[in-house]
Amino acid sequence: MDKLLLGRYIPGDSWVHRLDPRTKLIASFYYIGIVFLANNWQTYLMMFVATLFMIWLSGIKIGFFLKGVRPLIWLILFTVVLQVLFVRGGTVYWHWGWLWITEFGLINGAFIFVRFVLIIFMSTLLTLSTQPLSLADAVESLLKPLRVIRVPVTELALVLQIALRFVPTLMDQTTKIMNAQRARGVDFGEGNIFQQMKAVVPLLIPLFVSSFTTADELATAMEARGYQGGDDRTKYRILRYHRRDWVAAGGMLVLTGLLLLLRA
């Protein structure tokens, strides 16, 4: 559970850290969108190099990004296997019944794997280089136009902020409960998949109790401090775009142009 990086922030003063959170949020979603435009080895290689360059600019060790892949590795491998066995085309390397391993299947599987890794790396970069509070402020700022149709933007941003803030806390609490149960002789890795799922069930009740207790304490603390929601709240930090944000936007456009040129 402690491998999950969602909601964790690594302090720093890198070029990526100093970008406006709105720029990072928009760039991340834009990047995830253009990843699906890649359709050959040249485009995927270019996207991979661009991603490594952004990681280098952030000053965050690559090990953190590899940790972000680990919790999803089985989902990635399952998707890759489906592509390999069910996509047909090109040279047939193996065939048994309705299962095939073909040239196109292997290529598709490799592309799916790289695509997953790139998306996870970019999502991890956004999380590790942006404080949850700044990310919530960015969402609130970008959703401001929805206030015209009476969407509670401030409340939605608060919910996002609390969720991002307490995901690491919840994961740490889960790890503590698992360690306590291991000390009592519980082996979460023993037996088949159904036995392992059964072993996880005793975690749920103390985890739910801990979550509700934390939520109640947070609500009490907010009431004690006189918190009032609404659009009339002021902010200490005002978001402003700087030259580096426009440079980042230009870089994404250049990346898109190169991607379109290299597409098969």
Swiss-Prot record:
Listed HAMAP family: EcfT
Role, per record: Part of a common energy-coupling factor (ECF) ABC-transporter complex. Unlike classic ABC transporters this ECF transporter provides the energy necessary to transport a number of different substrates including 5-formyltetrahydrofolate and thiamine. Expression of the complex plus FolT or ThiT in Lactococcus lactis subsp. cremoris (strain NZ9000) allows 5-formyltetrahydrofolate or thiamine uptake respectively; 5-formyltetrahydrofolate or thiamine are not taken up in the absence of FolT/ThiT or the EcfA1A2T complex. Deenergized L.lactis subsp.
Transmembrane segments: 24-44, 45-65, 72-92, 106-126
Record GO cellular component, one term: plasma membrane
Organism: Lacticaseibacillus paracasei (strain ATCC 334 / BCRC 17002 / CCUG 31169 / CIP 107868 / KCTC 3260 / NRRL B-441) (Lactobacillus paracasei)
Covalent S-S links between cysteines: none
Underlying gene: ecfT
Protein's UniProt name: Energy-coupling factor transporter transmembrane protein EcfT
Subcellular location: Cell membrane
